[in-house]
Amino acid sequence: MSDQATTLKIKPLGDRILVKREEEASTARGGIILPDTAKKKQDRAEVLALGTGKKDDKGQQLPFEVQVGDIVLIDKYSGQELTVEGEEYVIVQMSEVIAVLQ
């Protein structure tokens, strides 16, 4: 678990993953400062913590396809959003992760 997730004491369960979306630039290319309402949700996020994992039909633990620290691509509207101490996080299922960016 990352230091940030440990400090917050957030532990996803099952095949869920705690991520933090990357921040949208607050200034447009022309130098115009964008209000929060004009910013779009980012679909890139950093993996902060992994749940306990999922088991197959035989009870074998299935490995996660991501690791803490990976930058992943998720759907803009997926997961459960939560705000802790003014910071926004999202808990998504492994199946909602579209790709790992390298």
Curated annotation (Swiss-Prot):
Kindly report the protein's main subcellular placement as a broad class.
Answer: cytoplasm
Q: Which GO terms describe its molecular function?
A: ATP binding; metal ion binding; protein folding chaperone; protein-folding chaperone binding; unfolded protein binding
What is this protein's function?
Together with the chaperonin GroEL, plays an essential role in assisting protein folding. The GroEL-GroES system forms a nano-cage that allows encapsulation of the non-native substrate proteins and provides a physical environment optimized to promote and accelerate protein folding. GroES binds to the apical surface of the GroEL ring, thereby capping the opening of the GroEL channel.
Q: What keywords does the record list, in alphabetical order?
A: Chaperone, Cytoplasm, Stress response
Q: What is this protein called?
A: Co-chaperonin GroES
Q: Which PROSITE patterns match?
A: CHAPERONINS_CPN10
Q: Which domain of life is it from?
A: Bacteria
Q: How does it assemble?
A: Heptamer of 7 subunits arranged in a ring. Interacts with the chaperonin GroEL.
> What's the name of its gene?
groES
Q: Tell me which Gene Ontology terms the entry assigns under biological process.
A: chaperone cofactor-dependent protein refolding
What does the sequence similarity comment in the record state about its family? Belongs to the GroES chaperonin family.
Listed InterPro entries:
Chaperonin_GroES, Chaperonin_GroES_sf, Chaprnonin_Cpn10_CS, GroES-like_sf
Provide the species name. Answer: Chlamydia muridarum (strain MoPn / Nigg)
Cell location: Cytoplasm
Provide a GO CC annotation, any one. Answer: cytoplasm
Q: Which PANTHER family match?
A: 10 KDA HEAT SHOCK PROTEIN, CO-CHAPERONIN GROES
Provide an example Pfam family for this protein.
Cpn10
